[in-house]
Curated annotation (Swiss-Prot):
It is an enzyme of class 2 (transferase). Disulfide bonds: none annotated. InterPro entries: Aminotrans_II_pyridoxalP_BS (IPR001917), Aminotransferase_I/II_large (IPR004839), HisP_aminotrans (IPR005861), HistidinolP_aminotransfase (IPR050106), PyrdxlP-dep_Trfase (IPR015424), PyrdxlP-dep_Trfase_major (IPR015421), PyrdxlP-dep_Trfase_small (IPR015422). It comes from the Bacteria. Its cofactor is pyridoxal 5'-phosphate. The modification N6-(pyridoxal phosphate)lysine is found at residue 210. It comes from Pseudomonas putida (strain ATCC 47054 / DSM 6125 / CFBP 8728 / NCIMB 11950 / KT2440). Homodimer. HAMAP family: HisC_aminotrans_2 (MF_01023). The lineage of its organism: Bacteria, Pseudomonadati, Pseudomonadota, Gammaproteobacteria, Pseudomonadales. Keywords: Amino-acid biosynthesis, Aminotransferase, Histidine biosynthesis, Pyridoxal phosphate, Transferase. Pathway: Amino-acid biosynthesis; L-histidine biosynthesis; L-histidine from 5-phospho-alpha-D-ribose 1-diphosphate: step 7/9. GO terms for molecular function: histidinol-phosphate transaminase activity; pyridoxal phosphate binding. Belongs to the class-II pyridoxal-phosphate-dependent aminotransferase family. Histidinol-phosphate aminotransferase subfamily. This is Histidinol-phosphate aminotransferase.
Length: 348
């Protein structure tokens, strides 16, 4: 703490990111990165940007990427916002759309950055308890609010809210912005982007860090009504007009255009997930239904924190959350078959 800090800084509780170990020998199953590399076509496109044009600023609007996203989802570029990772996109959403008199609503078990943003921007919030199956109860969100946000599939549980239920939540909150955080949607869910033309209060966020294997590039997006997008553009241009570099814009656009590679890698992750679920269940683990590139599991005879520590000693890193209701679960990223086997060997 320093006497030069602004007063609010001392009360901030920052987000704690997953460990990025320096040792290459570790099997990394803790931060939900894709075990398969980016699209070769995207890599080639990015290499093409590494030239003298780097002396020039990138397109502040990211139009090439917006067009690719719009074509992929059947929307217009005016309905698309792009930013430096979905975390930055979410930060702009909290800043630009959730600062109202009523509290913001989100699940008690969800992305741990949400309360951090609320603290940063002075937003009142209420964490609404998921049911015993870790699902949202629509009735719990039928009350005054400044907005609603939730991850779908949920993080860290991996549980999916069906699109019909998402629409029911939208219908019950026509006077509030509803943000569906779809970081993991491509691994088993149906995107809510199909609803944006019917609901002017819907905003859907996605990332290229998971299903498109570009976590190191930092690219995120939002799709919604042009009026909501305009609010984000105003915040962005009051903060950083150039959030995406030249290589990121082109590489992310090509990642959307290369559908064949995208579908192939998603299928491999999904297939590996289903195999690993069965293998863990055979070892006595309870595994929650997952539509993500990770699973949430617990063993009735093993303390989760101790198990995570023992796995790390054997070179396998998984994620353990010390918080109510889920302290006995481990979140395990789906790796290649070889990485998953290393986990199973360590458990044995």
């Amino acid at each position: 703490m320093s006497r030069f800090w602004s007063p609010f800084v001392k009360d901030l509780v920052p987000y704690v990111p997953g460990e990025q170990p320096k040792l290459a020998r570790l099997v990394k199953l803790n931060t939900n990165e894709n075990p398969y590399g980016p699209s070769p076509k995207a890599l080639e496109a990015m290499r093409g940007e590494l030239n003298d044009n780097l002396r020039l600023y990138p397109d502040p609007n990211g139009d090439r990427l917006k067009q690719a996203v719009a074509e992929y989802y059947g929307v217009t570029p005016a309905q698309v916002f792009v930013g430096n990772g979905s975390d930055e996109v979410l930060a702009h959403i909290f800043h630009g759309l959730f600062q109202h008199d009523a509290p913001l609503l989100f699940p008690d078990i969800s992305y741990s950055f949400y309360p951090v943003y609320c603290g940063l921007y002075g937003i009142a919030f209420e964490q609404v308890a998921l049911d015993e199956q870790f699902q949202i109860r629509i009735e719990d969100y039928k009350k005054p609010n400044a907005g609603i946000i939730f991850p779908n599939p949920n993080a860290p549980t991996g549980c999916l809210m069906p699109l019909q239920a998402v629409e029911e939540l939208l219908q019950a909150n026509r006077d509030s912005v509803v943000v569906v955080d779809e970081a993991y949607i491509d691994f088993g869910g149906e995107t809510a982007i199909s609803l944006v033309d019917r609901y002017d209060n819907l905003l859907v966020t996605q990332t290229l860090s998971k299903s498109r294997s570009l976590a190191g590039l930092r690219v995120g997006l939002a799709v919604g009504h042009p009026d909501l997008i305009e609010a984000l553009e105003r915040i962005k241009n009051s903060f950083n007009s150039y959030p995406l570099d030249r290589a990121a814009i082109v590489g992310a656009a090509v990642a959307f255009e290369d559908r064949e590679y995208f579908e192939e890698t998603c299928r491999k992750v999904i297939d590996s997930r289903e195999v690993l679920v069965g293998q863990l269940q055979a070892k006595g683990f309870e595994v929650l239904p997952s539509a993500a590139n990770f699973i949430f599991a617990r063993h009735p005879q093993q303390d989760a924190g101790e198990l995570a520590a023992r796995l790390r000693e054997q070179g396998v890193i998984v994620r353990h959350f010390k918080q109510p209701r889920i302290a006995q679960f481990l979140r395990i990223t789906i790796g290649t078959p070889e990485m998953n086997q290393a986990l199973l060997d360590a458990l044995s």
